[in-house]
Amino acid sequence: MSIRDWPAAERPRERLLEQGSASLSDAELLAIFLRTGVPGKSAVDLARHLLNQFGSLRLLLEADQEAFSKQLGLGPAKFAQLQAAQEMSKRHLAERSRQKTALENPQVVRDYLKVMLRHEPHEVFGCLFLDSKHQVLTFEALFRGSIDNTAVHPREVVKRSLANNAAAVILCHNHPSGNSDPSQADRLLTKRLQKALELIDVRVLDHFIVGDGEPLSMAECGWM
């Protein structure tokens, strides 16, 4: 049965407009993005099929163009639309983070870091550079690959802190495994960067680790 033949209260688009996007399932949200189904499948049926094929919404969003485009009902045009939507979301949250005080609204920072880092297939280490009022100046991804105590160079973090005229920084990196628990290398790296930045009077406020759930704050856990 076509979605057009469903009762209005059950159609994903109408439900989104009436109840908000948070009320929809992953399949319903994806169905709105797809807009149409394929012969024998409604957009919701197709969305469920795709989520089953990829394993989760996150894995679908992280898929490269080749893996994405070869699936039923998808293609280069849909891939381009999805990439554009994700980039708009990143830029929206980047602008929000620059307009709000990080320490007074840590959830804005968490939300921003989830969008920026959660879908990266490899580890990425970055910094949120803050001014003296702890307003976000900018975000920079500084290192990519295996993040350990030797891969991240304190001198580069110091250099970028000076270039951005930062008074404080929030460190962050992702764990592609999804487990946000800090490793011993993560803790050692944090200490090294704290010591290096102390020499130029830049304070490290926190180190967030982004996994599948809410980003973990090392400061809140008492590890800084």
From Swiss-Prot:
* One BP annotation, GO: proteolysis
**One GO molecular-function annotation for this sequence?**
metal ion binding
Alphabetically ordered keywords of this record: Hydrolase, Metal-binding, Metalloprotease, Protease, Zinc
Q: Which family does the record claim for this protein? A: Belongs to the UPF0758 family.
Per the record's keyword annotation, is Cytoplasm included, yes or no? no
Q: What is this protein called?
A: UPF0758 protein Pfl01_5539
The UniProt entry, under PANTHER family, shows:
DNA REPAIR PROTEIN RADC (PTHR30471), UPF0758 PROTEIN YEES-RELATED (PTHR30471:SF3)
Q: Which residues form the MPN domain?
A: 102-224
> In which residues is Zn(2+) bound?
H173, H175, D186
* InterPro entries to which the protein is assigned, alphabetical: MPN, RadC_JAB, RuvA_2-like, UPF0758, UPF0758_CS, UPF0758_N
Task: Give residue numbers for sequence motif JAMM motif.
Answer: 173-186
The yes or no answer to whether the keyword Metal-binding is present is yes
